[in-house]
Amino acid sequence: GFMLQDRGEMFSLDPNHMNSLIGGKRPFHTIIPAFITKNNKPLVSFGLMGGAMQPQGHAQIVINLIDFKMNLQEAGDAPRIRHAGSSQPTGEKMTDGGYLSLEKGISAEEILKLEKLGHKFQYDLGGFGGYQAIMLKDNVYIGASESRKDGHASGY
């Protein structure tokens, strides 16, 4: 026997649903590896597991690498923010703007800025994803594996 992934269960049989089952359509899912290029050449391949945290985490990793000039390991270890309560492809609708979960390490100054923008907060110890990456720099591969999950980067 064999098993297949269950992401197809995200389809809806309601023809008016945003994720309705239609021939040739792919289901909404969060299996999203990421790849960064620079000058049309490979730079970083990475992934961040964690359901709805995946696209948010991917964006934060790219911002950390490109905008904040963090190295591959720092980009994964940096504190993260997760938004919850958004409308979902399964049909749930956002009604109140949701909330931000803040990982330990976000500065009080940044929290105050977010608060002034009207964000609501929740503090969580988990659910911020798990990241691994490989970067090609100067013809040398560099690996990173963040501390939130099991794993490590090694080479030979």
Residue ranges and their predicted role:
Residues 1-124:
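Proteins synthesized as precursors that undergo proteolytic processing into mature forms
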Residues 108-156:
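In a subset of proteins, long, contiguous C-terminal domains/tails are tracked
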